[in-house]
Amino acid sequence: MGDRMLPAALRLAGGRAPILVPVPLTRARLRERGFNQADLLARALSRRTGWPTDCLLRRERGGPALARLGRRERARVAERAYSVNPDLPRALALHPEVLIVDDVVTTGATGVACAEALGTAGVECLGIVSFARTNPLAEPS
């Protein structure tokens, strides 16, 4: 799986060695599923690149699952769904840039929200890399 994301990750990194930051799940969702698919993808990509992976973001509990929402609602909910992990300064000592890793990009709201949360903490986000991208149906009017 890391092979599929490798070209985009290398292009976005531009010769740097960023921290791979998986999009987090809520604790409830992680317990239900038993794994975080974005974390598995980040680890696979890390094995191919040698870049570190670290869970620098937290998904705040509450709110609906983004996968079930339309474009506008996704953006509204995602805007306040992510926060920075308190371990952030220590993790960034050697690798000041990050790449966000997600399984699927639908509207881009999750990636933007994660990048904004990291940006407010002074982290340079080089981009988001995902395993797949969907082509969402138009929202009903």
Model-flagged regions — what are they?
Residues 1-100, 107-141:
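Conserved PRPP/pyrophosphate-binding segment of the phosphoribosyltransferase/PRPP-pathway fold
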